[in-house]
């Protein structure tokens, strides 16, 4: 199998996607023949930096491969860790990245998205002085003392818990429709209503923790699908500080923390496992990811792995939102199942929703249909190759696999296939990675209780 003059040999190929080329295998083969040093760095909030020192070929015949390798590397760093400024010490690659990361370039989506998230113009900088890596992880979570509120803001329901010294004394779920509502007062009132409902069951409120889908920097809502329909001017004015305002208006000056729901899932994993260094991957509507490091801290990385490239196949499926190809969202969520099902001979109603399409394959899998088995085996191969790639970036000990794609017999087959690929393709990593499905203890902790543990009380 060859891409851009780089040849890769695989033991495990997805039966329904024979052109799949794992990013890690491409990178390894590329670096075997690369000899010219190049350094780059991506800067994000609070002066944090992710630096990479690597090599390229630097020859005219390998120029396309060099550009592709650097493009995928920068994209990975941007969506894994976040950033608004790229530093690079190679003039040709600087010119290339500058032409891509602009309003008219191939990475216009990433350029605009990151500028919005970090509230700074996106820049590409040529320099010989590449800044070194600097992380400022936040100690967050695992605090169960006192009277706490945990709020989990979902896209179709919101859940709140009142927790006293680690015991949940009240919990409620309320259906709401945040994604279709353009008025941020609707969201604000829903949040305050939930907070007050929990507070009524405790003598006082010592701390409030919030879990929600989206990107949160310093507790501020920088991007979130809950507020999809809110106009941009109102978003700036009313949404970015919405959780902070709701908590302060209701309880005054209490400690609070707002975190991405993926990070809170990983935190719930650490609480149920009694150990740290957990990557949580929820395969549902999208690929939602969170990470708690070896010290039990949330890293401040974006962990938006749905946008991280996993496949070097130039004909990989396009993600409609970002316009890019070969990224996690088309492999590790219901889109991945629905992409492969027709290739296995499973007929799907094109007018059905993605969730309804997924149910067709799941139902066939429960009946041991061999077509459905091919779908889950193929995703298991994707995942085995990709977890080895993620491992080299994170160094996690546990992977917690969540979401509707992982449920039932399909999830079991996916997991077994993934384990086999790790064992046979990546023996140097396999014994260091423990794959986990959510157990009863994890469900007992739950998202809202883990959220309640986020802030340290006074």
Question: What are the residue ranges of the model-derived segments?
Answer:
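Structured, charged N-terminal subsegments at the starts of enzyme catalytic cores
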Residues: 143-147, 153-173, 181-184, 188-192
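Phosphate/ATP-binding catalytic cores across multiple sugar-kinase/actin-like superfamilies
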Residues: 378-396, 454
